[in-house]
Design a protein with these regions (language model features):
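Asp-based phosphoryl-transfer active-site loop
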Residues: 21-39
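Basic, amphipathic juxtamembrane/active-site segments
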Residues: 35-59, 253-255
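Short hydrophobic/aromatic-enriched beta-strand-loop microsegments
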Residues: 87-95, 107-108, 149-151, 197-199, ...
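Active-site phosphate-binding/coordination module
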Residues: 48-147
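Conserved acidic, metal-coordinating active-site core of Asp-based
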Residues: 125-247, 256
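Mg2+-dependent phosphoryl-transfer enzymes with acidic/Ser/Thr/Gly-rich catalytic loops
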Residues: 13-14, 18-22, 50-51, 206-287
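Short active-site oxyanion
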Residues: 62-68, 86-88, 172-174, 230-232, ...
Length: 287
């Protein structure tokens, strides 16, 4: 476990306020362990927080702190073991869908015309992606493309017309295996014009709209709650957590985090497999 002092670091001895802390938690690689020998899609469906994490969330609630999920996952892919943590709300789809309690305060999607043109390019170049929206996910798998990127019970579409037929076209982002990236240049400039790519680790990336990320989502949630950055914390492990870190006062990287994420953090805790979330919360006197 590493510890680095920084301007954002708050210790138990230097609390400036007794107001409840607000803590934002990534899911994959932070609350839930991803094993390298298990396909990412299976972990999304079957991964569960450890008993230590469940108890830590109970203690946070007991102390009056507000815990939020802050994940690239859409609401459709947040399963009961995570929902049962009983959070105060969620920043989902990497900042596109924002919830306080059960109320959705913002839900943003890719323009349908833009999405159509991108999917036409993916179909032409045989690029396989997981299209993710708040309430629906579709594996776009053109003929001749890779069949690895799927989830149990996922809807599969082979053509743009099929995507229209099986969905409402309300998608906010898409995920893919990194070996698809060389094909993206042949798709055209629409991707670089409208999207940012984040490496999620384990050979998988996601693309989100340029003006939508976890940092945007956190700032909107804090604004809605009437709070500034004081006594706000974030736990994360991958590139899409960097905007999240910029939106809070104190950032905590997991011990299994990417090097760039550790470098950006005020504090590096233990790995997800060693209950690093629990260690970090204890370090800051939050539980």
């Amino acid at each position: 476990m590493l510890h680095r002092e920084g301007t954002g670091l708050i210790s138990m001895r230097s609390e400036r306020s007794q107001e409840p802390a607000i803590i934002f938690f990534d899911i994959d690689g932070t609350l839930v362990t991803h094993r390298a020998d298990v396909p990412p899609g299976e972990t999304v469906v079957f991964g569960v927080p450890s008993p230590g994490v469940v108890e830590a969330f109970r203690r946070l609630r007991e102390r009056g702190h507000l815990a939020f999920i802050c994940s690239g996952r859409p609401r459709r892919l947040v399963y009961p073991p995570v929902l049962e943590l009983e959070t105060a709300g969620s920043v989902l789809s990497a900042g596109a869908c924002l919830m306080i309690g059960d109320e959705v305060i913002e839900d943003r999607f890719v323009d349908t015309g833009t999405l159509d043109r991108i999917l036409e390019g993916f179909e032409r170049e045989r690029v396989s992606v997981m299209l993710e929206g708040t309430d629906e996910c579709v594996t776009f798998m053109p003929e001749g493309s890779s069949d690895r990127l799927t989830l149990p019970h996922a809807t599969i579409a082979r053509t743009v017309d099929e995507v229209h037929a099986v969905s409402t076209m309300r998608f906010s982002k898409f995920a893919f295996y990194n070996d698809e990236i060389p094909k993206f240049e042949r798709v055209g400039d629409l991707l670089s014009e409208h999207f940012v790519r984040y490496d999620l680790g384990l050979g998988v990336s996601e693309m989100t709209l340029k003006d939508v990320d976890k940092g945007h989502g956190v700032r909107r949630v804090l604004e809605t709650l009437g709070r500034d950055r004081t006594r706000t914390f974030a736990f994360g492990d991958s590139e899409n957590d960097l905007p999240l870190f910029s939106a809070v006062e104190t950032s905590v990287a997991m011990g299994n985090a990417m090097p760039s994420v550790k470098e950006a953090a005020a504090y590096v805790t233990d790995s997800v497999a060693d209950d690093g979330v629990v260690t970090g919360l204890e370090h800051f006197g939050l539980i």
